Amino acid sequence: MRLYSLSVLYKGDPKVHLLKAAYDVSTFNFFQRSSVQEFMTFTSQLIAERSALGSRASVKEQEYLCHVYVRSDGLAGVVIADNEYPQRVCFTLLDKVLEEFSRQVSKMDWPSGSPATISYSALDGYLSKYQVQTP
């Protein structure tokens, strides 16, 4: 059971853009890592774009399960995990992250924000905390 990506996005007009993301690509071959990370960023944006405000969904993409939660204020979170990772845990994590993000980052910064301009550093910690260590 593994988490690969945790992203916070903003679903505004006309498109979705990434505000902050964390990735764990350590299980991939060194030469594949950047393309895997690119795929996860693209997939996260696409899924958030296709989801309605106020909705939750789980979408299978290749060998991954992508869990998306788009709040009614346009803030969205996407977790990309393997097929065995519990769906309920993913949505609990998304709830927690989006709630904390909305408290720490001003709503005025969401429409124009980018990973370089948004200061929110908790994603890497959540990604490693929610990894399930297999014995």
Model-derived segments and spans:
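Soluble N-terminal interaction domains of secretory/endomembrane membrane proteins
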Residues: 1-135
